[in-house]
């Protein structure tokens, strides 16, 4: 995937100017920057969700799966129902929930979960979907260090051989996910 952004602005605020990067296929790439530097905007452009910019994104596939910063879950239904709504098999949902330490919470309403648990449900949704590219925006928000390590190992295993782009402000996330390439914005 080749990204060439001549200009991206919100009103008179220029977010990107003459930004070029290449994302290698089949590996995990990591984009790191402080809060407010446009990581989420860049991720949305690469995933094809933001077309309001000057430039090009050359991509071999439009089959993109995105983990947003907001969990985007249905709060009033169970964890398992949130996953089954994707049209996936219940046994696959149970397997992913088990790997994300959420099996015991499968029948609870999402509204009853902590922020970290909700983040893991959002990750489960992404990991159950089949795509060519995965774009993960701050995937470990609200997770403690031990949970991060376990989940990073599972994500790396589950998405092995896939193109994965992760944006975060935390350098350690790159190491946890075994990123092949790291791009640092704002230096």
Segments and roles (model prediction):
Residues 47:
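Helix-to-loop junction immediately C-terminal to a conserved catalytic motif
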Residues 76-92:
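Q-loop/switch helix immediately C-terminal to the Walker
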Residues 90-105:
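Conserved ABC ATPase "signature" region
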Residues 109, 138-139:
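Walker B catalytic motif
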Residues 109-113, 117:
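Conserved ABC ATPase signature
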Residues 123:
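Hydrophobic anchor residue at the start of the ABC signature
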Residues 137, 144:
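ABC-family nucleotide-binding domains
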């Amino acid at each position: 995937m080749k990204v060439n952004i001549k200009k991206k602005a919100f009103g008179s605020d220029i977010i990107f100017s003459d930004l070029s990067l290449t994302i290698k296929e089949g590996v995990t790439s990591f984009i790191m920057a402080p809060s407010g530097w446009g990581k989420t905007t860049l991720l949305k452009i690469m995933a094809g969700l933001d077309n309001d910019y000057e430039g090009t994104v050359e991509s071999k596939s439009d089959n993109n799966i995105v983990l947003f910063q907001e969990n985007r879950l249905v709060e009033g239904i169970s964890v398992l129902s949130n996953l089954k709504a994707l049209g996936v098999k219940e046994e696959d949902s149970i397997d992913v929930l088990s790997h994300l330490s959420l099996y015991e919470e499968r029948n609870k309403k999402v509204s009853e979960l902590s922020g970290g648990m909700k983040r893991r449900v959002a990750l489960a949704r992404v990991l159950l979907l089949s795509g060519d590219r995965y774009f993960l925006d701050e995937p470990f928000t609200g997770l403690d260090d031990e949970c991060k390590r376990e989940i990073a190992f599972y994500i790396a295993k589950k998405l092995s051989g896939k193109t994965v782009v992760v944006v975060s402000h935390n350098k350690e996330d790159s190491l946890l996910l075994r990123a092949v390439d790291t791009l640092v914005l704002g230096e």
